[in-house]
Amino acid sequence: MNRLSLLPPGLYRICPRLPRRPARRAGRWASKLHSSVALILLATALPVEADVADTVAKVKPAVVGVGTFQPTGRPRANLLGTGFAVLDGRHVVSCAHIFAKPLDTEKKAVHAVFIGRDRQMAVRSARLVATDSARDLALLRIDGAPLPTLKLGDSARAREGWQLYFTGYPIGSILGLNASTHRAGLAAIVPIFTPMQSADQLNARTLKQARDAYEVFELDAIAYPGNSGSPVWHPETGEVLGVLNSVYVKGAKEAALSTPSGISYAIPVSYVHALLKRAALDAAEPNASEPNASE
């Protein structure tokens, strides 16, 4: 083998006729250079992944399943979505639409929070203490020992292009209480109002929706039923920036499972701060320093 071929193309072009001895030295130098570059790239890449893994390990204990529990029903536990503990560890944030259906009082059904994993699952009864139907947010209170908590960040500092993550229970009724974490690119910050296809669709209700429209996070991520209420968090700090609540569906509702669009939406955590304030609870102060965007 021609030893000159071991040189990177740029070096090969500027010294095509090196004498034999210098060529050997150049080859050894290039080999060492390649090794050094590889080590540098490895050293800079690994900590990023390690940091995310460390953050996942800190986030997951605060993420819970939410739904209903009925002692005389089958099944007794009905996992409907995701939530996460905040403040004193006895308050859980989730989505309001999860609790829209009235409880079956004949079967003594109660709102519930599910902790742990499948066979080690523990059930805590919960009660709704505040809701914001317009922003699809709910706050529950549980009794017993406090849970690990997540810190609420400042969603006003979120920027399009950030790489975020969310943790929850996709299709939890089938896959069980096993939290999974997914990456989500913050594709856009958009009004939640859906434009009408024709003037015939304009009425008092749609006009009010347009007037009251607020901005949400559009995420480049696939989410499934059960992910509603998942915290959307920053990989460096673990701070919650949003609450996953919906997906864009192409066609019928069933398409959310069969042909997911890859477009999901999250409610900015600023509305969680407002909900806690309205419930006379003190939320954690947002971090004063702006986190760096993760590429």
Regions found by a protein language model. Name each.
Residues 4-37:
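Bacterial N-terminal signal peptides that target proteins for export
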Residues 168, 239-240, 274-280, 287-295:
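C-terminal recognition in membrane/secretory proteostasis and scaffolding
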Residues 59-76, 142-151, 180-277:
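Active-site region of chymotrypsin-like
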Residues 87-133:
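Catalytic-histidine neighborhood of serine endopeptidases
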Residues 51-52, 69-95, 122-125, 229, ...:
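A conserved glycine-rich beta-strand in the N-terminal activation segment of trypsin-fold
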Residues 45-47:
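N-terminal signal peptide c-region/cleavage motif recognized by signal peptidases
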